[in-house]
Amino acid sequence: MNKPIKTITVALAAIASMSVQQTEACTRATYIGPDNTVITGRTMDWKEDLMSNIYVFPRGMQRAGYNKGNTVNWTSKYGSVIAAGYDIGTCDGMNEKGLVASLLFLPESVYHRPGDNRPIMGISIWTQYVLDNFATVREAVDELKKESFRIDAPDLPNGAASTLHLAITDETGNTAVLEYIDGNLEIHEGKQYQVMTNSPKYE
């Protein structure tokens, strides 16, 4: 067995083993091999069926961050393959440039700022916005740190709060964790952020 295949096989086995452990939290992990192989995987430890479906989206799609009013509009630069949660929003995906995005639960999330009138971005399309527009983590961070929109996060179909945080990794293994805490976006970027779970927030 050659080295790249062996490395990928070992990493996939490790990720698979995480998914069968008895846990109460979703976990996302990125493996960076000695030959710069980058593999990202996650578990989905949720209390019910998320009714997920897989979708393939081409580049050139017209998008809106919200279904009415003051919102963000864009045309997708990159095609992507995604998994939808409750079949209404993008939870996980990878675009054609190798950018991977994963949305996980974070009870500490607070999106709201008093008197905030920035354009609205629905939590259900936030992940897709990143996949549509950015080829690398650095590109995404440079834009998202401007905080040019606010997140609207209605409750999930089962009544749970949509308190979520986002992790993105590019083909180099660079990763960013994005969390809304007290109405402000906190970004942690670097190859050292290889694991993300639910609570607590990053410090």
Feature annotation, model-predicted:
Residues 25-118, 146-147, 151:
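A contiguous strand-loop segment
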Residues 1-9:
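Bacterial N-terminal signal peptides that target proteins for export
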Residues 9-17:
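Bacterial N-terminal signal peptides
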Residues 157-203:
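Extended amphipathic alpha-helical segments with heptad-repeat/coiled-coil character used for oligomerization
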Residues 19-25:
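Sec/Tat signal peptide C-region and signal peptidase I cleavage site
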Residues 141, 152-160:
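Surface-exposed patches in mature extracellular/periplasmic domains of secreted proteins
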Residues 117-150:
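Alpha/propeptide regions of enzymes that mature by internal proteolysis
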Residues 85-86, 122-123, 160:
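Short, glycine/acidic-rich beta->alpha junctions
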